[in-house]
Amino acid sequence: QETQYFGPGTRLLVL
């Protein structure tokens, strides 16, 4: 599981 941040207040969880 990792969390990628694309910008302020924006994140994508990849399980």
From Swiss-Prot:
Compartments where found: Cell membrane
GO CC terms in record: T cell receptor complex
Top-level taxon in the UniProt lineage: Eukaryota
Primary location group: membrane
GO biological processes: adaptive immune response
Keyword ATP-binding annotated: no
Keywords assigned: Adaptive immunity, Cell membrane, Immunity, Membrane, Receptor, T cell receptor
Cystines in this chain: none
UniProt KW Nucleus keyword: no
Subunit structure comment from the entry: Alpha-beta TR is a heterodimer composed of an alpha and beta chain; disulfide-linked. The alpha-beta TR is associated with the transmembrane signaling CD3 coreceptor proteins to form the TR-CD3 (TcR or TCR). The assembly of alpha-beta TR heterodimers with CD3 occurs in the endoplasmic reticulum where a single alpha-beta TR heterodimer associates with one CD3D-CD3E heterodimer, one CD3G-CD3E heterodimer and one CD247 homodimer forming a stable octameric structure. CD3D-CD3E and CD3G-CD3E heterodimers preferentially associate with TR alpha and TR beta chains, respectively.
Function summary: J region of the variable domain of T cell receptor (TR) beta chain that participates in the antigen recognition. Alpha-beta T cell receptors are antigen specific receptors which are essential to the immune response and are present on the cell surface of T lymphocytes. Recognize peptide-major histocompatibility (MH) (pMH) complexes that are displayed by antigen presenting cells (APC), a prerequisite for efficient T cell adaptive immunity against pathogens.
Protein name: T cell receptor beta joining 2-5
